[in-house]
Amino acid sequence: DLARVIFTAIYKGVVPGVYHFSDEGVCSWYDFAKAIHRIAGITTCKVSPLHTNEYPAKAPRPHYSVLDKTKVKTTYNIEIPHWEESLEACIKELNA
């Protein structure tokens, strides 16, 4: 998805600036892992949630860090797919 946006920016003409990009929707790492298990049909192991304070990190992490994609969407007039849709397409391609 990011490669498509970069191609679009190059094709339409790059407008200088800082752009944020991620697929639509929000999820935690736990939600992401559960979706991978569900989409890939993995049943051999369990995904368990882990609170941020249980996972040591060298840098402090924000509690909520969703990116605002308004600028990239309006500048290049693009539709961004939902992360689960893109994840499903990726897993299907990997399994092909």
Segments and roles (model prediction):
Residues 5, 9-58:
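Mid/C-terminal beta-alpha module of Rossmann-like enzyme folds, strongest
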Residues 1-2, 28, 82-83:
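An acidic site on a long C-lobe helix of protein kinase domains
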Residues 44-47, 80-84:
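Short, surface-exposed acidic
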Residues 53-73:
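A hydrophobic C-terminal alpha-helical subdomain
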Residues 26, 49, 66-67, 80:
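Short aromatic/basic micro-patch
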Residues 83-96:
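Amphipathic terminal alpha-helices
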